[in-house]
Amino acid sequence: MTHPIRWAFPDEPGPEGLSVSGSYFDRTPYVEQDEEGRAVYVEHHRTLGDRVRDVAASGFRLVDLVEPEWPAWNTSEWGGWSPLRGNLIPGTAIFVCVRD
């Protein structure tokens, strides 16, 4: 999944994407609407703690949380991500879980 920390930063690959623009703890959904005001895209932010509690409430046990580092060979920009940003904050969170 996309790493929850990215919620606090603007989707910009350059230096402007390195400054916090909102609260990490703000769980207000991000909503894009069409001309009639209907939701056409929605993202629901949750913190790492929220996700860990979701895992436990679902009967799973968290074994590991993997936050892959930006690969040195990747010099591309994609959306709000670039080597500049990717070398400083994680873009992905992988929850490794088992059901006991």
Model-derived regions, located:
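Conserved class I S-adenosyl-L-methionine
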Residues: 1-33, 42
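Active-site beta-loop-alpha junctions enriched in small/polar residues
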Residues: 2, 67-68
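Generic structural signal for helix capping and beta-alpha/helix-loop junctions
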Residues: 7, 72-74
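Short alpha-helix
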Residues: 23-33, 40-67
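Generic signal for short, ordered secondary-structure residues
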Residues: 33-35, 76
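Core SAM-dependent methyltransferase catalytic element
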Residues: 58-60, 75-100
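Short, solvent-exposed coil/turn elements at secondary-structure transition points
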Residues: 68-71, 100
